[in-house]
């Protein structure tokens, strides 16, 4: 038997489409899932970790993040964005009434990663742009 294929492979085109949602909860949850999936693809390629192991519920997001951070692959503003995107997701996933001020602060801290933008962009627009630019930066590691 060969390797079990992941349920889906992340793509920038799909990410751009799926982030065009009106539901804020969905926006933050889906954005983080895409980032986590690309982290898994990096771990699979760079460290030869089987996708079955990465899909196991015992392997937490923080473990994936730490492996990439401590190996030196995840650094600078990409690392910062990955952490902030996960923090935002956690605030929505683990609280009935998330602290909107804390979420706004996290979004404000996100970096555009070389993408041009306007100052009039909404916080949700900034989140979308930053998730896509972070995904693109991570994809270059493959």
Region spans (language model):
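Amphipathic alpha-helical interface elements
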Residues: 1-142
């Amino acid at each position: 038997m060969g390797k079990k294929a992941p349920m889906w492979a992340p793509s920038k085109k799909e990410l751009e489409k799926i982030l065009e949602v009106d539901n804020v909860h969905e926006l933050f949850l889906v954005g983080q899932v895409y980032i986590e999936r690309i982290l898994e693809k990096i771990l699979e390629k760079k460290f030869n970790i089987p996708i079955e192991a990465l899909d196991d519920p015992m392997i937490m997001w923080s473990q994936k993040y730490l492996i990439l951070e401590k190996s030196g692959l995840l650094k600078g503003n990409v690392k910062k964005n990955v952490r902030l995107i996960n923090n935002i997701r956690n605030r929505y996933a683990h609280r009935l009434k998330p602290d909107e001020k804390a979420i706004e602060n996290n979004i404000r801290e996100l970096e555009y990663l070389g993408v041009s933008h306007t100052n009039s962009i909404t916080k949700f627009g900034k989140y979308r742009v930053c998730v896509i630019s972070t995904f693109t930066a991570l994809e270059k590691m493959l």
